[in-house]
């Protein structure tokens, strides 16, 4: 397996498929998953001739179960360590959910200053801010995130089964075809990681205000989200992101869930390709 060691000694696992001379696409996973969540997209774009790269966030999957740094700044720095190690340039960065926040922070702090990023995609992503606050009155009440923390602490294994079997993929909706394999794969990825990293990561994805990150992105950015996202409400995510981005394009998918990359990859993947090749 391939790893890069960060400046603070964390080993970050990554996948790197395809020709080293091909244009790179970098994928950023959501909470509490791993690079494996992008396997469908990685195979699709590998077949289109791209170089595809994805890493496990610190404390997640095969990366070091470190006790520190479970915040967007460290997430972005870890991504930069992988990108610099592989010397990726002219890259497209695609982030899902928490990974979208990671993409925004990476681009602003590293990708743009180093001239390494060409385009970005935010899929069902958490910016600008999830939690309700005085400056964000329509956000999600803190009690919701406290409930996630409580579920994780009480019985992480069962909580992850229930989360994947319910809102994440919209499997709780009537007449929805449920895939036990998809549920099991979500659970498998989640249980690979550190409970501490996942617990502390809730604060990172819910309480990090990234409005300024979005305003500072200077590359073309595609915003994609389903209007039946039960995890990250699209009215407080995609519809706000597009207002803050300088060069944004918005695509809303009627009836699609938070995990639409998996449930509707046959639609999402060609849309991603069209944006990348435009």
Predicted regions located by residue number:
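Conserved HGGG/HGGXW glycine-rich cap/lid loop of the alpha/beta-hydrolase fold
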Residues: 7-68
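Conserved acidic catalytic loop of the alpha/beta-hydrolase fold
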Residues: 74-91
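Flexible "cap/lid" loop of the alpha/beta hydrolase fold
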Residues: 104-154
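Conserved alpha/beta-hydrolase catalytic His-Asp/Glu region
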Residues: 128-140, 150-215
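Short beta-strand/loop motif that positions the catalytic acidic residue
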Residues: 217, 223-225, 229
């Amino acid at each position: 397996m391939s790893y890069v060691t960060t400046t603070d000694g964390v080993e970050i696992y990554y996948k790197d498929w395809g020709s080293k001379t091909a244009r790179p696409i970098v994928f950023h996973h959501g909470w509490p998953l791993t690079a494996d969540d992008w396997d469908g997209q990685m195979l699709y774009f590998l077949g289109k001739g791209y170089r595809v790269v994805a890493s496990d966030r610190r404390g997640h999957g095969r990366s070091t179960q470190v006790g520190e740094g479970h915040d967007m700044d460290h997430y972005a720095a870890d991504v930069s360590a992988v990108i610099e190690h592989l010397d990726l340039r002219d890259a497209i960065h695609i982030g899902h959910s928490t990974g979208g926040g990671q993409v925004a922070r990476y681009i602003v702090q590293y990708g743009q200053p180093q001239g390494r990023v060409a385009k970005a995609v935010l899929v069902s992503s958490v910016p600008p801010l999830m939690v309700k606050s005085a400056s964000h009155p329509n956000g999600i009440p803190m009690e919701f995130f406290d409930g996630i923390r409580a579920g994780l602490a009480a019985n992480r294994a069962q909580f992850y089964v229930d989360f994947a079997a319910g809102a994440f993929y919209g499997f709780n909706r009537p007449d929805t075809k449920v895939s036990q394999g998809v549920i099991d794969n979500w659970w498998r990825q989640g249980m690979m990681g550190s409970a501490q990293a996942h617990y502390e990561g809730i604060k990172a994805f819910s309480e990090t205000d990234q409005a300024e990150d979005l305003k500072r992105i200077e590359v073309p950015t595609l915003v994609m989200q389903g209007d039946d996202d039960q995890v990250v409400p699209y009215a407080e995510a995609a519809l706000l992101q597009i207002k803050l981005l300088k060069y944004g394009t918005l695509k809303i998918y009627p009836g699609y869930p938070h995990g639409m990359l998996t449930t509707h990859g046959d639609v999402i993947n060609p849309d991603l390709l069209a944006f990348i090749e435009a």
